[in-house]
Amino acid sequence: MEYSDAMHRLVSGQDGRVYLDTSPRVCIKGAEERDGLGYGLLADEDVFPFFELRSAAVDMRGASQKSYDNAELRKRIAAQLDTCMAAGVRHVVLSAFGCGAFQNPSPIVAETYKQEVRKRKEHFDVVAFAIFHAGYGPDNFGVFREIFEGA
């Protein structure tokens, strides 16, 4: 999918908001190529609708970590949270924003999320992070767990 300039500006949080589709969605899981792959199906009573939030992290691939712009990260994270607040979203599942393929530094990303969530804590009932660690590559899960422990 190629984004228009307006969509790129939106998902980059340039104006303090990001894309939020408030039409409820439900994930549909297809058949696996073979047994033992993927996840089991949820029971019908455990299936829940969700809203889609799109927000683009800075792509640090090939860039020097010295060029990392924490103010830009903070702006984009604040835009995510402010978008949810403006829409009355009180339960949010976020990610290790840009810490995988885009090579953003997970300790800085996690700490920035912690600070920005703390500023807005009265607006959320649940803030969770869905972070998968396959056992190889960066351990973003461990970093986020350590930084958020006791928060």
Please report, for each region that a protein language model flagged, where it lies by residue:
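Macrodomain-like recognition of ADP-ribose-binding/processing modules
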Residues: 1-151
